[in-house]
Each structure stands twice: as C-alpha cells, then as structure tokens.
Amino acid sequence: MKRFISRRSFLKTAGVTTAAAAVAVGAPSASACFGKGKLPEITILYTNDVHTYIDHKSPELTYASIAALKKSYEEQGKNVLLVDAGDHIQGTAYGSMDDGATIIRLMNEAGYDLATPGNHEFDYGMDRAKMVLKEADFPYVSCNWIDLRSGLRVLPSIKLFNIKGAFVAFVGITTPETFTKSTPAYFMNAKQTRYIYDILGGDDGAKLYDAVQKAIDKAKTLGADYIIGLGHLGVDPSSAPWTSKDVIAHTTGFNAFIDGHSHTVMAGETVADAAGTPVLLTQTGSYFKNIGCMTINPESAVGTITTTLISTYEGADPVVDAIAKEWVGDVDDMLGEEIAVGDGEFYISDAETGKRRIRSAETNLGDFVADGIYAYFNEIEELHCDIAVMNGGGIRADVPAGAWSFKTCKMVSPFGNVACLMSVTGKQIQDALEFAARFAGSGQENGGFLHVAGATYEIHTEIPNTVLTDEKNVWLGSATGTPRVQNVKIYDKALGDYVPLDPERKYALAGMNYTLRNLGDGFAMFDGAELIKDYVSEDYLVMSSYAMMFGGADGDGLPHLTSANSPLADYPGYLLDYENPYGAGRITIL
C-alpha cells in the first residue's frame, strides 16, 4: 500500500531548518503564461558534497532516505526534481574501492535527475570521470568544462525540464579550483606537455562569469521560466574570485543557486546579482547532514522561491538501502581486519574548537601520516629518505582512540595516491614549503599545506606572500621577496639532530605522486626532478604498514600507537609527540 505523508506528519519525522530567506521571482512572460494555464508548484530536492558517506551512525540521512522522500512527495502529487551539486563519488573507502561505481548506482536507483561535476569527480583520472558520465542514468551539466582540442564544452551547459508547462533550467558550473584540488596532470595529454582540458576561470573570474552568463542567456532563449544555478563553487573566501557569490554578483538572470564545495550549511541567503536583483543561494553542508528542499511557488503575482534543509527522515527505499548495505558489508569485509590500537585520538581538527586544522597547521595525524611515508622508505623499502611531505587536503578524517583497521586508514587516506621517492635540491624543498605556506595565518585553508617528517620549519606570517602562480594557482616561480618559510632544518640520523637545509644539496624527498609528480595542489617546482622509485604503495597501505610497525603489543596482540612505540623512536633526537593533538612542534607558525 502506498504511504502518504501529510505535512503535519512529515514535520514530525523530518527535522526542518527553515530557510533564512525567500525571494520573489519575476513572473513568466505573457507569452509563456498564455495558453499554458497556471504554472505548477515545483519541488527541487538537492544534495552536495556527499563524498560517499553511505555508512552513518549519525547523521541518519542516506541515498535510501532521499529516494524515499522523493517518492513520498511524488505520491502526494508534487512535481519533484532531484539534483546534486557535485563531489559524490570520492571521500571514503566506499567510493575509492570501486572508483565511485556503486555511488553512481545508488544515485541512479535513488532517482537523481541531474548533477554537476565537482572537483573530486576527477580524482580517479579523466578517463574514469568521463566513464562516470556514461554510467549515470541522469545527465551532468557544466558550462565551463572545455575540451581545448575542439574548443567545445565537454558537457551541456544547461538542462531544461518541462514540468507541466513550466520550464526550469539548471546551469551547471564546476569550480576552476579543480585543476589544483584534483590532479592537474589529468587535464593534460599523455606526455603531460600541454593541457587538453580546461575549467574556465580566469585570474579575475571573467572567463567564468562569461561562460555562466552565456549559459543563462541560452536558457532564456529556450524559454526558461526559472533559471537555477547548480554549481560546485562554494563561498570560502580562499576560492575568490570563483565563489558562488562572485558569480551571482557578476551575472544576471539567476532566480536561485544551489551550491557546493565549501561544505557550508546555508538554508538560504539572498545575494544581489549584477543588476541588484536578489538571488537565493543555498547549500546543504556535506556528508548527508541535510537534504535541501527548494519550492518554486507561482501562486503570488511574482511567485516565490523558498528553501528548507531537512536533517532527519525516517523513510528508506528498500532497494537503495539493500544496495548500500551490501556494498558497506563488502568493503568492511575487505578492510575490516584490526591492525593496531590507538591509545589516544589522532586529529585533523583543532582538539579544542573542533575546527578543521589540517590544512593550515600541524596536527598529530599530519605528523603520523608523514612519518608513515618516511618510515616506509627508510625501514620497509630500505631506501634512504631525508624528508617526507604530505598535503593536508589528503588527510580526511579524525581517528578516535581504539581499534584501527585497514578501513580506518582508508578513511584517512581515501584517494588511492601512490608513494614515490625523488631526488630534489634543497632549493626545490624550500620552494615547496614556501608555496604550501602562502595562505598561513590568513584564516584561509589550503589543501596543499605540507606536513613533514624528517624536517622542521618556521612560517613568518607577518611577511607577505610573493610566490608566483598562474591563474590556476599552479606554482610558477620562487618568492620574489623575503621568504615566509625560514629556518628549514632536515633530520640527520647520524648526528641525531636537525641541521639547516642546504639549497644546493640533493635530498631524497618522499611523498605522494599527487604532490610530487602530478602537480597536485599546484606543486610544479618538482618538474624534471630525478625519480628514485615510483608506484611503491597506495596511500592507505603506507599508513597501515606504519601502524603495524609499532611495538607495545599486550594481551590483544596488536601494536599500540604511541610515540614510544613508533619505530622512529629509535632515531636519536627525532621529534615525536603523537600524544599532543597539535603535533611534535615540527611546524612553527609565527
């Protein structure tokens, strides 16, 4: 029997945060209204930045939830669309174990009607990104993803839906930060000599704004009654001039904008467009914390658009739920073996405030992951390694005290990047640290902030950043002024001490190929460096191997992850302090 939910009973089962704003939308033209009769009310359910979070204890929302909610609304006679604003196939082991295939299957079964690609849709490579487009039963849109060989868009810029005579257009937009927050090499030819794909942005945002405005104008030409942005841009100031607010302020024609990328909980905020017209901007946060619900109500003379965020829902589609549970079980079986015990918590966030810290300052988990790379080469591969680096954006989850499994490490390092070892100059190391520290002290996060093993350094935040970068934030040249990063020291095991970096000397530098070889986060200073060994081991396996090297096993027979039990504790004078949430003091921010 079909289950109908009244508004009263729905509000009992769904936690709803009322929108902070509603906007009036311009009435459809006389020609659009005449002969069609009254335009219908339209409901748009939306998600963003789910990042493969399908195994929740809390919050409780899942793809099964949103599938059931959509069906419930449809059974009530509502006209419903379900859309996603990007970053859905990557984030946990439930995405990376099959390159997002099961996530796309879940979205297909849940009844998604449309999506736009986020930067993490490219994390498994360009070939996989394009295969995802074929596996999805729903279309993708992006007005600014360009094939430079043909000059054409890879995807349609808009999708127009005819909802009982009302035409709703969605304009897809992908963040230009994709180049550096995914892997720039994926956008290049096989020899990595030139870019063959582009995500239009521009230093001043002009290329992005132009692409968006052209898409809006196309939607108008096709007779759209309502034009909705479906963008993966975000509102973080560090993303300027490519934020959703920047785009709205430099274009005209949007009625509302569904956003993603910055993981911001924004039920609804009005932003003035270039003509001063208010546009409703909304974002659900991340990880299925909320489902967005936008209602287009043409009842009044001008009509209104309102938004709510739904934080809980009791319904679950049985088919979608079964697919998710089977996959969770499979992954847990593959990765569930316990390998160690954490006697304390390892953090990517500030232990006191809960605010994410890993992209701007040292933490004990940042130290641990970097140490894992360092120890892997020195102890397992038995290859001399002077220094290891790990980008903060590649460290994704706090780890509570208790049992560690392969799955734990996969949750922390879900990208599938591979460790490598290179011979570089001290000058290249200095350039990398300077580039990584360019936002330090500003309050802006940087996925390329470098955690280190076998090294210490200072960041002098009062000194302005003068590193040269291109419009895609890829490194172009050394700092032209006084460097912010100073007193870089490299650990010397024979001396049992840290000694000053020699710019002219060659060092063995370890890290992930994402950073050292594939221009990830824009690290181009290592181009042409001598490769000692590549494709050594996947990121989470490097971390797992390090955990299993610890001592301290007691009655449980498992290594205990304390500073004293680390194999690096045998290195005289090596800085270790996993008991301190803020790390061992390798990075000093002044």
Where are these regions (language model features)?
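N-terminal export signals
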Residues: M1-R3, S9-S31
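Catalytic centers of hydrolytic enzymes
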Residues: R3, K38-T43, T47, T52-P59, ...
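Acidic, metal/ion-coordinating pockets
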Residues: R7, L11, G15, C33-E314, ...
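Generic hydrophobic alpha-helical segments
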Residues: T17-A21, Y73, T264, I380, ...
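A short, compositionally biased domain-edge/stem linker segment
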Residues: A22-G35, A68, K493-G496
